[in-house]
Amino acid sequence: MWEGYLNAVEEYIAEHDDVTARLVVDRFHVAQQYRDDFDTLRKQEMKRLKQELPPEVYAQDVKGTLWPLRKNHQDLDEEERIRLRRLFQYAPRLHQAYTLREELTAIFNRAQTMQQAERRLTSWISKVERLNATCFRPFVKTLSSHWTLIINYFADRVTSGFVEGLNNKIRTITRRCYGIRKPSTLFQRLWLDLEARLFTTPRRAFTLSTT
């Protein structure tokens, strides 16, 4: 979502008639921001509860809820759900924000048209404003600033996961090649390593039938 990068890509597309592309803000970068906003509130609420609750109550009902809070609700086991219910008794604002976060995640997980996504996101923003869920104000601002690019995700639901995974592999290989000075040698090593990974990856067998 860096403006400099987005502007550079837009300029390139505008200057090349043979390039047809749709700019998309990756959904995982979007999720990172609204989850960070939720986490900011979580820290504030944990600090408040530690000051207000008796130590034994805090230890029993609040401590140890970090990972259950960070997990998607559908991935929680029964024990984790019980822990969150106990926590939310003392932190209704956190419960409200948790529910809004899960509703937003559900929107991005749902297969739908761009128009449907627009309606659901608009409804979510209205709900945030109506409930005065101030922790999400930074995200709502980002959502408004990059509205079209975020909505574009729902056209094909494509993410940059493959590219980022490839970049991680390249960084790992580059660290192993410390001391290599010639760029051509480094690129040869990258090519050999990545090609080897492709050839050693188990592949599904296909049968071609002829009539």
Report residues per predicted region:
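Short, surface-exposed amphipathic charged segments that create phosphate/polyanion-binding patches used
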Residues: R35-K47
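Short, polar/flexible loop-turn hinges at active-site or ligand-entry regions and domain interfaces
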Residues: D18-L23, M46-K50
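Acidic/histidine-rich catalytic cores and adjacent linkers
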Residues: W2-D18, F28-R35, Q51-T211
